[in-house]
Amino acid sequence: MQPINTFQAKAVALPIENIDTDQIIPARYLKVTDKNGLGEALFTDWRGEPDFVLNQPYAQGAGVLIAGHNFGCGSSREHAPWALQGFGFQAVISTYFADIFKGNALKNGLLPIVVDAPTLARLTEQCLANQTIDVSVDLENQQVHVAGETISFPIDAFSKHCLLHGVDQLGYIQAQETAIQAYEASHAARVNTVGA
């Protein structure tokens, strides 16, 4: 997983509420265990429509998706963040993410950014009026910068640490190996394990 600190990207808007994981990537793609190429399957059932936003030339190279409320609802599938990342998205902005999707996204290095409804409406409007908008994301300070506006967003400390350092949960534990061994050694010396 690549570390995330700050990045700049263009954003595209997909202002549809309740986009579920089957719409993000249909179940027929879940047999694949290789992330490569999944970006081509992102929203595949909608990509047949010529007017779909991700089919437009201006959407190519977009790194931020501005989505509607309740993004990623439905069944758990790690393939959903994989497909979003495969297309090139580094972050998704919404007012709410389904818990399972949010967890899968964070564990795979995709940043789910939660904003309030008026902010989402404003960003969506700006994006639709201009096709794309330029966005700067600063994870360290938990801020998004758009058109001279600074928007703060919440993220839990553990997820933030993992994203900043480019590690998943296992990588985090492995990085603590020396401290864990030192604790175990000192703990074993203090605890009587005879008869245990």
UniProtKB/Swiss-Prot annotation:
Its annotated pathway reads: Amino-acid biosynthesis; L-leucine biosynthesis; L-leucine from 3-methyl-2-oxobutanoate: step 2/4
Q: Which Pfam families match?
A: Aconitase_C
Q: What is its EC number?
A: 4.2.1.33
- Signal peptide location: none
Ordered alphabetically, the record's keywords are: Amino-acid biosynthesis, Branched-chain amino acid biosynthesis, Leucine biosynthesis, Lyase
Gene Ontology CC terms: 3-isopropylmalate dehydratase complex
First-tier enzyme category under EC: lyase
Q: Which GO terms describe its molecular function?
A: 3-isopropylmalate dehydratase activity
Which reactions are catalysed by this chain?
(2R,3S)-3-isopropylmalate = (2S)-2-isopropylmalate
Instruction: Please list the GO biological process terms of this entry.
Output: L-leucine biosynthetic process
- Which SUPFAM superfamilies does the UniProt entry name for this protein? LeuD/IlvD-like (SSF52016)
Q: Which CDD domains match?
A: IPMI_Swivel
Summarizing the function annotation, the protein's role is: Catalyzes the isomerization between 2-isopropylmalate and 3-isopropylmalate, via the formation of 2-isopropylmaleate.
Q: Which HAMAP family match?
A: LeuD_type1
Family according to the record: Belongs to the LeuD family. LeuD type 1 subfamily.
- Assembly, per entry: Heterodimer of LeuC and LeuD.
Report the protein name in the record: 3-isopropylmalate dehydratase small subunit
User: What is the protein's species of origin?
Assistant: Herpetosiphon aurantiacus (strain ATCC 23779 / DSM 785 / 114-95)
Its gene name is leuD
